[in-house]
Every structure is written in structure tokens, then in C-alpha cells.
């Protein structure tokens, strides 16, 4: 662990120096050169009046004459940033810049960091709606639960463009993609799995919903938060989201914590806090168990300990271990596919298509216990995911088929 701490300390200092040297990691680049007065007249006044007139006559043409089609807003209120917590909009800006450069480097998408100086749900929704004319999609980021669920749901309902809270759906897509490949190795069926999910924030809730939509049996799922196992009738630490989950899961109303949840489990998914899973817990799982311990920077259990205790496949959220389950595997391709069809929304079918496409990037020959998910830098990831998402966009009627007629 001391070596691990030294490595992180070195990365922190290197990152700090880079941000100071560059004064941020993002800039705006021009697509045109202004060498003459004529150039200026075409790019700006008076020439720019003509695309303005066209868009005024048909709002859908904004996708043809402006940056909107390939532009995403990365929006946060700074209330739940990485493992740092509620650090506010100013301190959240480096993370949003980092997200924006991933969009650009991986998918060629222009993304702008938007850090809102409010954590009032209604004000966040109102601000994003007012900004929407500029963007082809909205990526909500690092907004605390349960507020994030309402903010995303309302914006999806009220805006005519793709809105996704990446901490929810990006995570769920990557987890399910990894699980699809893990199940090929352990030769188990999704509907038969006994599953334990630790953490019921944005990621945990979205993973639960995604698994059930994909075919997992909710009656075979146990969920656990900081207050222990969730069950119908529990009073402490509940909210309306957890109450919905409680009605579907844990039919025996098992009480206690993770220790009581682990026996005979086939799959553990952790999106909670580091070091809370013991080797004895993993040892009590079913044969050929799968452990996805994604707390950062310290997983719920370290991979070597999980393997030592009998886990067949182990994944984490870290790049220095095999099987890194990282959102950057999903959101660039997801948005590229959605923006490419000028989609009005991101549908469940598009998310599911993204997960299957991501899983299939790993070929049969490459698949192994230490390789269930592609490397984030693998060049085939974004094109594969984007193509699948674009196809699903048309199939689920989310795409704008004719921009000349769209409003």
C-alpha cells in the first residue's frame, strides 16, 4: 500500500505541474483563418446574417450551419466530484476540462465545461435549459444523489436533445459490458446470478436498473448502502429511489451488512468505499465468482486479495490493474453515435447497444480472466460503440431523419 500511495502522490504532482504550465488543458480552436477583410466579412458580419436567416426560418438547420451537431456541454454543480465530495464548481473545473479533452481526443467531439454556482435542483435544471440551444447533447457530471436522478429525468423530459448523467449510465454500460464477457468465461447465465451491489448512489442505482432491464432477476439481488442491506420496511437512510429498489429485491428481508449478503453470491459490484470487503466475504461466494470492486482510489478489496480468496475474475476502476472498468470506454462512443444522428434523446436501446458493442470489441481470442474489457486507448472502441448506438438511434426512433424538416 505504501508503494501504491507513492505512485499516486507522483501522479498528483505531475498533474498539478501540467495544469499550472498549460493554465488548464482545454482551448477553443478556429476552423477558419481570417487573413483578409473578405474572410472577416464571410465569417462574421455581414455574411453571417444569411445562416442566421436560414435558422430563423427553420430551427432544425442549426445542426447544419453551426457547431451544435458536434458539441456537448459537460455540466456539474460540484456536489459529488470523484472521491473528493462536495468541492464546489471552481474546484470541479479541472475534472470537467479533463472530461472535455477525452471527448475530443477519443471521439472528435467538442465539449465545453460548465460549472454551475448553484446546487439548487430547480436552478440547475433552469440553467441547463437556457444553455441548450448551443449544444447537441448534455453530459451531466458529478452531481450528488438523489438530486441527480430528478435533474436528469426532468431535463430528458423537457429538452429535445440527448441528456445523460454519465456517473449513472456510463458506469452501468461499462459494468454490463465487462459482465457479458465475464459470463462467457464462467459459463453462467445473467438471470441465474445471485448479485450483491454495494453503494446506492448514482452509479449503484443505475447499475441495478441496467442489470434488471438486461434480464437479471431482482429477487436474486441484494443491495447495500452505508446503513446496511436494503429491504422493504427499512426506515433508516431511505429515499424514494431506495424504496423502489427495496420492493423488488431482498424478498427474504435479510438484515445486516455485506457480510450477510456475500454467502453464495455469484457477482459482487462495488461502487462504494475502499477496503470494506474482506477475503472471508469473497471466500463465502459461489464457485467461479466475479468481483467488480470499483471504489477509487482504493477498491473495496484489492485484486490480489480477491483472487487469493477464490474470485475467478476481478475488475476495478483503476488503470494499474487488469480489467479497468472506466466510463471513458462508454461516453465518447455513446455521444458520437447520438450526435451523428442528431438524436433527440438517448434511449435504453441505445445504451444496451453500446454495452454489447463494447463487450464485442474483445475478441474470442483475446478474452481471458484478465481481459474482459478493452483498454481505454483501444482505437476500435469508439467507432464500434458509435456505430451500434447510431443504428439503435434509428431503430428506437430517436434520430432526426430529415434536418430540413426538423424543428
Protein language model features and the residues they cover:
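Electropositive phosphate-/nucleotide-binding environments in soluble metabolic enzymes
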Residues: 30, 34, 45-53, 90-97, ...
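Short, ordered loop/turn segments at secondary-structure junctions
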Residues: 77-79, 87, 116-117, 142-145, ...
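N-terminal ligand-binding/catalytic initiation module
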Residues: 1-163, 386, 392
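ADP-ribose/adenylate-binding Rossmann-like module
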Residues: 139-142, 267-321
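A short, aliphatic-rich alpha-helical micro-motif
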Residues: 132, 190, 261-262, 282-285
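Glycine-rich phosphate/diphosphate-binding loop of Rossmann-like nucleotide-binding domains
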Residues: 82, 89-107, 159, 165, ...
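Adenosine-phosphate binding glycine-rich loop
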Residues: 5, 166, 186-188, 293-404
Amino acid at each position: 500500500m505504501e508503494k501504491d500511495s507513492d505512485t499516486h502522490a507522483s501522479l498528483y504532482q505531475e498533474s498539478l505541474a501540467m495544469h499550472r504550465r498549460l493554465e488548464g488543458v482545454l482551448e477553443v480552436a478556429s476552423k477558419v483563418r481570417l487573413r483578409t477583410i473578405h474572410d472577416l466579412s464571410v465569417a462574421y458580419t455581414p455574411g453571417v446574417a444569411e445562416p442566421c436567416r436560414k435558422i430563423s426560418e427553420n430551427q432544425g438547420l442549426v445542426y447544419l450551419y453551426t457547431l451544435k451537431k458536434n458539441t456537448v456541454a459537460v455540466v456539474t454543480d460540484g456536489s459529488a466530484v470523484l472521491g473528493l465530495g462536495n468541492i464546489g464548481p471552481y474546484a470541479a473545473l479541472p475534472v470537467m476540462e479533463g472530461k472535455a479533452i477525452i471527448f475530443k481526443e477519443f471521439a472528435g467531439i467538442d465539449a465545453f465545461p460548465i460549472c454551475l454556482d448553484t446546487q439548487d435542483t430547480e436552478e440547475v435544471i433552469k440553467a441547463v435549459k437556457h444553455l441548450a440551444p448551443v449544444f447537441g447533447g448534455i453530459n451531466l457530471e458529478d452531481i450528488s444523489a438523489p438530486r441527480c436522478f430528478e435533474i436528469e429525468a426532468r431535463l430528458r423530459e423537457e429538452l429535445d436533445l440527448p441528456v445523460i448523467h454519465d456517473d449513472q449510465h456510463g458506469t452501468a454500460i461499462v459494468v454490463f459490458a465487462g459482465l457479458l464477457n465475464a459470463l462467457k468465461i464462467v459459463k453462467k447465465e445473467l438471470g441465474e446470478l445471485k448479485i450483491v451491489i454495494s453503494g446506492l448512489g448514482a452509479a449503484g442505482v443505475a447499475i441495478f436498473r441496467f442489470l434488471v432491464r438486461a434480464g437479471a432477476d431482482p429477487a436474486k439481488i441484494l443491495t447495500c448502502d452505508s446503513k446496511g442491506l436494503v429491504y422493504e420496511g427499512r426506515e433508516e437512510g431511505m429515499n424514494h429511489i431506495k424504496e423502489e429498489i427495496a420492493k423488488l429485491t431482498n424478498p427474504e428481508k435479510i438484515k445486516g451488512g455485506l457480510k450477510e449478503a456475500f454467502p453464495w453470491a455469484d457477482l459482487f459490484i462495488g461502487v462504494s468505499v475502499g477496503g470494506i470487503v474482506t477475503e472471508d466475504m469473497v471466500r463465502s461466494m459461489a464457485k467461479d465468482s466475479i468481483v467488480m470492486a470499483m471504489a477509487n482510489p482504493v477498491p473495496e478489496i484489492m485484486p490480489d486479495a480477491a483472487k487469493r480468496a477464490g474470485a475467478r475474475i476481478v475488475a476495478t476502476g483503476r488503470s494499474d490493474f487488469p480489467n479497468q472498468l472506466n466510463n471513458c470506454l462508454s461516453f465518447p462512443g455513446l455521444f458520437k453515435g447520438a450526435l451523428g444522428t442528431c438524436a433527440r434523446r438517448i434511449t435504453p436501446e441505445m445504451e444496451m447497444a453500446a454495452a454489447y458493442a463494447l463487450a464485442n470489441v474483445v475478441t474470442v481470442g483475446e478474452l481471458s480472466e484478465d481481459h474482459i474489457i478493452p483498454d481505454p486507448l483501444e482505437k476500435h472502441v469508439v467507432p464500434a460503440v458509435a456505430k451500434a448506438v447510431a443504428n439503435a438511434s434509428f431503430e428506437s426512433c430517436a434520430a432526426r431523419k430529415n434536418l430540413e424538416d426538423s424543428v
